[in-house]
């Protein structure tokens, strides 16, 4: 029995919604990388070297963004499950009103 006023279904829905938004972000990053790879052939000489350096940095940063999205989604899920578990465990210690 929960005595605290928390909207658990909202926490669960937030995790699912965040997952959908994270998937959209990942898709956008993948599309940007595909567009960059398609335009790579147009660069020559110094422009080609600059493009390759910028693209390498983009790939590095996009990997970090994806990792942060994974961590954020896990944290939202953990918040809901740990809240429910701790609240249920503490509910037995409450005395009747």
Curated annotation (Swiss-Prot):
Keywords linked to the UniProt accession: Secreted
One GO term describing the cellular component: extracellular region
Coarse class of the protein's main subcellular location: secreted
SUPFAM superfamilies: EsxAB dimer-like
Family of this protein: Belongs to the WXG100 family. CFP-10 subfamily.
Subunit structure: Forms a tight 1:1 complex with EsxH.
This protein's name: ESAT-6-like protein EsxG
